[in-house]
C-alpha cells in the first residue's frame, strides 16, 4: 500500500504537454538569443537547442553522463501557460549529472566555456582564446554549491536585456522551487532526440511526447495556480532569502495568496530568512539592485510599485529585527524607489534638489540659512548583522 501511495504521488507530479505547449517549447528552443560579450568581444547568436546539444555531447565525450536535460523557471511556465503574468525572463536549463568531486565541477565549467567557441563568428581566431578569456567575456555569473544536501553549479551567460541563458548542473539539490507557479520543469530529452533523428519538421500530427513535472508535487494544482495567478507553497521554512523578493514580484503582477491567513506566516518566514541570508545593509542593497536589473530590465514602470510592495511586506511582517535596523532597511528601499522615479523623470534627481522651506518664527539668528541643499545618499560602509534569532 505504501508503494502504491508513493507511486500515486509521483504520477500526480507529471503531465503530458499538449500540442500548443509543445509548439511553444519548440519556439523557445529554436529562438535565437544573443549572448553579449564584454569589451570588443562579439555577440554570440545561439539557440537553446544548439547550446544544449553541444554541451551535452561534449560532457559525454568527457565521461560525464547527462541523465536528462530540463527547461526550468519562467520559461517553463511560459510554455505551459502563455499569458501567465510572469513573462519569460531567464532561460534556465538543468542538466542532471553526477558531481562527486571537485574534478567534475571543474570539467563541467571547462566544457561549457569551450562550447562557446562553436558560436563565435567566422573569422575569429579561436586558437588564441582560452577558457578564462571566454569566462571574462561572456559569463554573467558563476556559482558552485557543495553542502551535505546540495551539489550543483550554475553558469549564467550574459544578455543585456536581462534574458540570460542559465546552465545549471545538478547532482543534488534540497529545494528546487519557491512557489507552486515556479515549480515546473519540462523534460527535453524526447524533443532533443526528435531534432537529432527526424528529417521531418515538427507539427501537430508529428511530434514527440513531452513530459512536464511540478516539483511542488501536484501538477494539476500548480497548473491551476499558474492559470489563475495564485500564490501557494509548501514547507515555507525552507525558502531562502530571495523568496521575499520573488513573493513581492508575484504581488506586483497581480498574483494573490490562496490563503490569506497562512500568507502572514509565510511573510514572516520570508522576511526572517532574507535578513539571515543578507545580514548587512550593503548586501541588501546589492541584492535588491541586482534583482531589479535582472527581473525588471524591460519593465521600468513596474519597479516603483514593486519596491513599494516590498517595503510594505518588510514593514508589516519583520519580527526578528531590531528597530533601528528595520528602519534602515525600509529607508534603503525608499531611496531605491526615489531613484527609480528620478530615472523615469517623474521627479527630479534627489541628489541635485534644492529644498526650500519657511523657518519657524523663533529663528531670528541672522546667520541662519533658510534653505537646504540635499546631498547624495549616505553610503553604508560599516556592515554588521541586522537580525536577531527568533525565539
Curated annotation (Swiss-Prot):
<keyword id="KW-0963">Cytoplasm</keyword>
<dbReference type="GO" id="GO:0003723">
    <property type="term" value="F:RNA binding"/>
</dbReference>
<comment type="similarity">
    <text>Belongs to the TENT family.</text>
</comment>
<dbReference type="Pfam" id="PF07984">
    <property type="entry name" value="NTP_transf_7"/>
</dbReference>
<protein>
    <recommendedName>
        <fullName>Terminal nucleotidyltransferase 5C</fullName>
        <ecNumber>2.7.7.19</ecNumber>
    </recommendedName>
</protein>
<dbReference type="GO" id="GO:0005634">
    <property type="term" value="C:nucleus"/>
</dbReference>
<keyword id="KW-0539">Nucleus</keyword>
<dbReference type="GO" id="GO:0045596">
    <property type="term" value="P:negative regulation of cell differentiation"/>
</dbReference>
<dbReference type="GO" id="GO:1990817">
    <property type="term" value="F:poly(A) RNA polymerase activity"/>
</dbReference>
<keyword id="KW-0945">Host-virus interaction</keyword>
<keyword id="KW-0694">RNA-binding</keyword>
<dbReference type="GO" id="GO:0001701">
    <property type="term" value="P:in utero embryonic development"/>
</dbReference>
<dbReference type="GO" id="GO:0005813">
    <property type="term" value="C:centrosome"/>
</dbReference>
<dbReference type="GO" id="GO:0048255">
    <property type="term" value="P:mRNA stabilization"/>
</dbReference>
<comment type="function">
    <text>Catalyzes the transfer of one adenosine molecule from an ATP to an mRNA poly(A) tail bearing a 3'-OH terminal group and enhances mRNA stability and gene expression. Can also elongate RNA oligos ending with uridine molecule, provided that the sequence is adenosine-rich. Mainly targets mRNAs encoding endoplasmic reticulum-targeted protein.</text>
</comment>
<keyword id="KW-0206">Cytoskeleton</keyword>
<comment type="subunit">
    <text>Interacts with BCCIP and PABPC1; the interaction has no effect on TENT5C poly(A) polymerase function. Interacts with PLK4; this interaction leads to the TENT5C recruitment into the centrosome.</text>
</comment>
<dbReference type="GO" id="GO:0005737">
    <property type="term" value="C:cytoplasm"/>
</dbReference>
<dbReference type="InterPro" id="IPR012937">
    <property type="entry name" value="TET5"/>
</dbReference>
<keyword id="KW-0548">Nucleotidyltransferase</keyword>
<dbReference type="GO" id="GO:0005654">
    <property type="term" value="C:nucleoplasm"/>
</dbReference>
<keyword id="KW-0808">Transferase</keyword>
<comment type="function">
    <text>(Microbial infection) Seems to enhance replication of some viruses, including yellow fever virus, in response to type I interferon.</text>
</comment>
Amino acid at each position: 500500500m505504501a508503494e502504491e501511495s508513493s507511486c500515486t504521488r509521483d504520477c500526480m507530479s507529471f503531465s503530458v504537454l499538449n500540442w500548443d505547449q509543445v509548439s511553444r517549447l519548440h519556439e523557445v528552443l529554436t529562438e535565437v538569443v544573443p549572448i553579449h560579450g564584454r569589451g570588443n568581444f562579439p555577440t554570440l547568436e545561439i539557440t537553446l537547442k544548439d547550446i544544449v546539444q553541444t554541451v551535452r555531447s561534449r560532457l559525454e565525450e568527457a565521461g560525464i553522463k547527462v541523465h536528462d536535460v530540463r527547461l526550468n523557471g519562467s520559461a517553463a511556465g511560459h510554455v505551459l501557460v502563455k499569458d501567465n503574468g510572469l513573462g519569460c525572463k531567464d532561460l534556465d536549463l538543468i542538466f542532471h549529472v553526477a558531481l562527486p568531486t571537485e574534478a567534475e565541477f571543474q570539467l563541467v565549467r571547462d566544457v561549457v566555456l569551450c562550447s562557446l567557441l562553436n558560436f563565435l563568428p567566422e573569422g575569429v581566431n579561436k586558437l588564441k582564446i582560452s577558457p578564462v578569456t571566454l569566462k571574462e567575456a561572456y559569463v554573467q555569473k558563476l556559482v558552485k554549491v557543495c553542502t551535505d544536501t546540495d551539489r550543483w553549479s550554475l553558469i549564467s551567460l550574459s544578455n543585456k536585456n536581462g534574458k540570460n541563458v542559465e546552465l545549471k548542473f545538478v547532482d543534488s539539490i534540497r529545494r528546487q522551487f519557491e512557489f507552486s507557479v515556479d515549480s515546473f520543469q519540462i523534460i527535453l530529452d524526447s524533443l532533443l532526440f526528435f531534432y537529432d533523428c527526424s528529417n521531418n519538421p515538427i507539427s501537430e500530427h508529428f511530434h514527440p511526447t513531452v513530459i512536464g513535472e511540478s516539483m511542488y508535487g501536484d501538477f494539476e494544482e500548480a497548473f491551476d495556480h499558474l492559470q489563475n495567478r495564485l500564490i501557494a507553497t509548501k514547507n515555507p521554512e525552507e525558502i531562502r532569502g530571495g523568496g521575499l523578493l520573488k513573493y513581492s514580484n508575484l504581488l506586483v503582477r497581480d498574483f494573490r495568496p490562496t490563503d490569506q491567513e497562512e500568507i502572514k506566516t509565510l511573510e514572516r518566514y520570508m522576511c526572517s530568512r532574507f535578513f539571515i541570508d543578507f545580514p548587512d545593509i550593503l548586501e541588501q542593497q546589492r541584492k535588491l539592485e541586482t534583482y531589479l536589473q535582472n527581473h525588471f530590465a524591460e519593465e521600468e514602470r513596474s519597479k516603483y510599485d514593486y519596491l513599494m510592495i516590498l517595503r510594505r511586506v518588510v514593514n508589516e511582517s519583520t519580527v526578528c529585527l531590531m528597530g533601528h535596523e528595520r528602519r534602515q532597511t525600509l529607508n534603503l528601499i525608499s531611496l531605491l524607489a526615489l531613484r527609480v522615479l528620478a530615472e523615469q523623470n517623474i521627479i527630479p534627481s534627489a541628489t541635485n534638489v534644492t529644498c526650500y522651506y519657511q523657518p519657524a518664527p523663533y529663528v531670528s539668528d541672522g546667520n541662519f540659512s533658510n534653505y537646504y541643499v540635499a546631498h547624495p545618499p549616505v553610503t553604508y560602509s560599516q556592515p554588521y548583522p541586522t537580525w536577531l534569532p527568533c525565539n
